[in-house]
C-alpha cells in the first residue's frame, strides 16, 4: 500500500489483543479544566447496519447476506446490555492488560453510526420502496425503550450505500435527500425546531456535525471528511474551523467516518485481474490518496486520539496510519461494535460482536493508550 502520511499498517493488528507500547503512546495533552478532563466518557460506535426492508419484504440478496431485522434486533439487545457487563480481563485466553479490566462498563453516552445505515443507496435498485429502509433504521436505531430500540441517543452517519443511489429521472436526488434530511432532522438546531439529538456545531453545507461529551470533542464526517461525490460539499474548511474553535489547547478529539485506511477502503483497479483489490495500481475504488492526505493535513495539530470507521464488513481491525489510531468493528448486521472510554487521560477501546439472542457478546480486540 502506498505511503500516505508516515507509515500505514497493512493489516489489522491481532484479533486477540493489541496494547500500545509505552514508547508509542500518543500524549493526551491536559485540558485547562482539570475536573472536566477527569470526567469519564463511554460511548459505542457501530457501522454498516444495512437496513434492507423493501416494502413488505427485503431487497434482493439481503436474506442470504444476513441483513435481516432479526439480526439487527440481536445487535440492539447486545448494545443495550453492554452497560451491565465488565471490561474484559481476558480475550482468547490472553490478558487484555486494560487498566479498567474487570470494571463495570456502565451506561454509555450514546451510539455513533459510521455510515451505511441503509442498504440500497449503493446503486442496487432505484425504487420508491427503498424509503422503508430508513424507516426500518429509525424504528431500530433510535433512542427508545424496550428490547427493539437503542436505549441511549444515536448519532447518525452516512456512507456510500446511503449516498450513491440515483433515483429514476427526473427525481435523481430523492434517496440522497431523504437520508440527508434524516441527519438534519435528528441533529440540526434551528429557530423553529429542536432536534432529538442536537449537535453543538452543524455544517448546513456538508451535514457534518460535532459535539462534546465532557473533555472529549467528537466529529461526524459521514462518508469521509472532504467528500465531494454526488454533489456533496467538502467539509474540510468547516472541520478546520471546528477544531480550531472547539478543540484548541490539546482537547482530545475523536472522528467518525465510513471509509478508512484498511486494504478494502484503499483498494485500486487491478487490470491484470479486472477487479479492484489491494495490489492494484489503477483508479482508486473508494477514495484517493489525495483525499486521504487532505483530511490528514486538515487535522494536523489537533489532538486526534482516534478515527472510527466502517465499510469493510468481516474483519475487526485496530491499526494505524501515520500517528493516528484507527478502529473498525465488523458490520452491525453481523453483530459488530466498538466500545470506547476516555477516563483520567486514558483511552480504551474494545471491539466485539453479538453472539446470541439474549444480549451476549464476545470481545475480540483490546487497545489502550495512556498519557503522562
Residue ranges and their predicted role:
Residues 1-13:
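N-terminal secretory signal peptides
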Residues 119-247, 278, 294-300, 317-349, ...:
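Extended active-site neighborhood of metal-dependent phosphoesterases/phosphodiesterases
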